[in-house]
């Protein structure tokens, strides 16, 4: 069985027995918990082998939580006092791509800075966030709201209160604050994060290490991806965040994670901390069916067509292929996840399971609820309105699917919003957001080619024309260019020039309306339609925000009455999950995991992408230069491993820690059968995939010779005597 790669029969038999035991004892480790909830889980954490006091885990100022950080869309952690950060290779891909040229291809060859002076700028989108304060502000957001307000009026009042809370929090400009909703608007927490703006690329292995197996192995196991990279946070000499500058110095992180090369075995407990993006476990059956039958099939078809267009438009041009490498990688990841969701819904009728849960809840609510049947009727109507509007929003997405047009629309909206007092501007267009807008408009140059963008827009307009007329925003058709004219429209625009694009920042609406640039003219022409759609969304959301919190209060009470876990859906805020190292059975007669090894790289390697491992890595495997990273039972180096931890998108790069809080791996994926966990957690098949620290350290030592980083980190190596004793006793993985 490839997963184990064990040369001796008796070792294979012993491992299978251990795996069988692990399968039978794997527990339902459901929950993406807010840190302050962890003291309620003392017994569960103890059962999982976590020895860190729960009260300590709840304290963001103490180790290990103070070492957990966020990147845009990803998670990471400090691993040295000098701001060294470890995350996934795919999370650092934008920084790698930004510094890559056809002559100096860091995507293909990898990159290692032997000195601090050699570290490369991560670019305007590579930001680091350190959460240092979380406070419950539910009362300040919701108390005293007039129950008779319309949906739009309620939405606007809640937004006004949230903006005031954010402004109050951001008096120190080193911090970025937000007030996200939890439990679908039932609770609000104000979160303060130190925002570090100078983040540099330190080390990334070759793409054929970090992304070995590519999209073929994405969401699959066993796999052998070394999905890791290192960044470094820099600040001004006063220790405060500063714009990128050669005068900046490494950030002195208060805490950092030690790295354990001592290894794990099946059944060992792990703790995982990061910033999961979004789950939908409290959605109603109607919402599940909408996603299953409408949203996901349309998304899969659109992304498939978009990827085909990008491939055709960049073919034969290495520079264009590099420009769109990150875009294609991201789209492929979303596509495979979407198809996995569709397959998962086909394999297991989650909507029917939710029907049964919903029926049981409504029966309980009839006896215990305070809102009566009117609340549930209101809820069903609000959900129906939300789904109907979502169809039009999807059509709008196709009608405006041009990166250059999106930039023009940003400029038009910014000009309009800047006519208002700052507190009255739309969120995202306030003074606090100007640096982000400029960075976003600048960043376009990394992944933009006029001919490619024009081809993508032409294909998107053709897709839009095939959407049912009832699902297209009223009046939009007459405002759009013909699909046949999209390429010429993009080619004729001056916005493709970064300097000219940025020069429009701060211009008045009249100047934009007077522009002869065809893309700006299209953005101006469609602005009223965009505003109308946004206004309708605010009204729908306001109605949902009025009804759903009361519904969620009842659902929480119902779940607690059954002794079931109650945690909020993921929303890109700091969460903690726990689990055990465990295999799983995706189908009858097949047991997978929990470890893959470097032997699998030799078996899969074809010399052709995506199974084209570097020669120096292959030679190190053949020479068995495994050293202290050799597992005593596997007799080789583990690459990736499985656990029962509860994860989702955004958890990429999350620190996987052992029971005492040492880093033992990085989360980067989940199994294909697990993808529907965003909607329904099935403990039997839900497995997260992590890269093993031992493989990371082995690649750094034996393949890329990143000795400077190995010296910088605090690494707990296994004691030779202990390893020998364990091997003699036959203790396995």
Language model: regions and residue ranges:
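Positively charged n-region of N-terminal signal peptides that target proteins for export
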Residues: 1-7, 11
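Terminal presequence/propeptide segments associated with secretion/organelle targeting
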Residues: 2-4, 16, 23-733
């Amino acid at each position: 069985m490839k997963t184990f790669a064990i040369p001796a029969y008796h070792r294979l038999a012993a491992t299978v027995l251990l795996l069988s035991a692990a399968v039978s004892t794997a527990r339902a480790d459901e929950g993406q918990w807010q840190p302050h909830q962890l003291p309620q889980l003392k017994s569960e954490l103890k059962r999982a082998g976590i020895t860190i006091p729960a009260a300590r885990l709840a304290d963001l100022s103490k180790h290990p939580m103070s070492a957990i950080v966020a990147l845009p869309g990803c998670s990471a952690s400090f691993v040295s006092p000098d701001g060294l950060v470890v995350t996934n290779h795919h999370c650092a891909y934008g920084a790698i791509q930004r510094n890559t040229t056809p002559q100096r291809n860091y995507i293909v060859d990898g990159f290692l800075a032997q000195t601090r002076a050699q570290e490369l700028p991560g670019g305007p989108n590579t930001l680091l966030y350190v959460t240092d304060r979380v406070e419950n502000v539910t009362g300040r957001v919701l108390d005293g709201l007039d129950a008779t307000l319309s949906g739009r009026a309620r939405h606007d009042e809640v937004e006004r209160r949230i903006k005031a809370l954010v402004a109050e929090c951001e008096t120190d400009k080193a911090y970025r604050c937000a007030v996200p909703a939890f439990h679908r608007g039932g609770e609000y927490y104000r979160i303060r994060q130190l925002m570090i703006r100078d983040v540099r690329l330190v080390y990334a292995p070759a793409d054929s290490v970090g992304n070995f197996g590519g999209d073929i192995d994405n969401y699959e196991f066993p796999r052998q991806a070394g999905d890791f990279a290192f960044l470094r946070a820099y600040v001004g000499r006063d220790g405060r965040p500063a714009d990128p500058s050669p005068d900046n110095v490494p950030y002195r992180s208060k805490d950092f994670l030690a790295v354990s090369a001592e290894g794990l075995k099946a059944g060992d407990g792990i703790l995982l901390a990061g910033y999961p993006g979004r789950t939908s476990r409290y959605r109603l059956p109607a919402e599940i069916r909408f996603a299953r039958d409408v949203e996901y099939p349309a998304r899969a078809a659109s992304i498939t067509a978009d990827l085909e267009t990008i491939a055709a438009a960049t073919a034969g041009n290495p520079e264009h292929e590099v420009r769109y490498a990150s875009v294609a990688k991201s789209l492929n990841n979303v596509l495979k996840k979407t198809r996995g969701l569709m397959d998962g819904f086909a394999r297991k009728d989650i909507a029917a399971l939710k029907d049964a849960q919903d029926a049981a809840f409504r029966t309980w609510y009839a006896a215990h609820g305070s809102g009566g049947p009117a609340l549930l009727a209101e809820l069903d109507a609000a959900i129906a309105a939300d789904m109907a509007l979502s169809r039009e929003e999807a059509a709008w997405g196709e009608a405006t699917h041009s990166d250059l047009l999106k930039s023009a629309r940003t400029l038009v909206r910014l000009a309009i919003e800047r006519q208002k007092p700052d507190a009255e501007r739309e969120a995202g267009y306030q003074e606090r957001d100007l640096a982000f807008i400029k960075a976003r408009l600048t960043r376009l140059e990394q992944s933009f080619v006029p001919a490619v963008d024009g081809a993508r827009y032409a294909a998107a307009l053709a897709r839009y024309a095939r959407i049912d007329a009832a699902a297209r925003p009223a009046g939009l058709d007459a405002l759009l260019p013909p699909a046949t004219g999209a390429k010429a429209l993009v080619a004729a625009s001056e916005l493709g020039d970064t300097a000219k694009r940025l020069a429009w920042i701060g211009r008045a609406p009249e100047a934009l309306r007077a522009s002869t640039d065809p893309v700006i003219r299209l953005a101006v022409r469609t602005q009223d339609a965009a505003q109308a759609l946004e206004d309708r969304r605010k009204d729908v959301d306001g109605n949902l925000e009025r009804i759903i919190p009361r519904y969620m209060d009842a659902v929480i009470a119902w779940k607690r009455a059954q002794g079931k876990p109650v945690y909020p859906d993921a929303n890109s805020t700091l969460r903690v999950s726990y689990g055990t190292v465990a295999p799983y059975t995706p189908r009858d007669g097949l047991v997978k995991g929990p470890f893959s090894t470097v032997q699998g790289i030799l078996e899969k390697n074809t010399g052709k992408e995506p199974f084209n491992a570097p020669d120096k890595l292959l030679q190190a495997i053949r020479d068995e230069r495994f050293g202290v990273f050799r597992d005593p039972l596997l007799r080789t180096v583990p690459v990736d491993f499985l656990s029962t931890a509860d994860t989702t998108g955004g958890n990429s790069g999350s620190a996987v820690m052992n029971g005492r809080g040492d880093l033992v791996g990085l989360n980067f994926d989940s199994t294909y059968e697990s993808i529907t966990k965003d909607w329904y957690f099935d403990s039997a098949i839900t497995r997260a995939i992590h890269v093993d620290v031992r493989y990371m350290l082995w690649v750094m030592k034996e393949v890329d010779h990143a000795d400077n980083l190995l010296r910088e980190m605090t690494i707990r190596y296994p004691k030779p005597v202990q390893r020998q004793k364990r091997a003699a006793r036959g203790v396995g993985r």
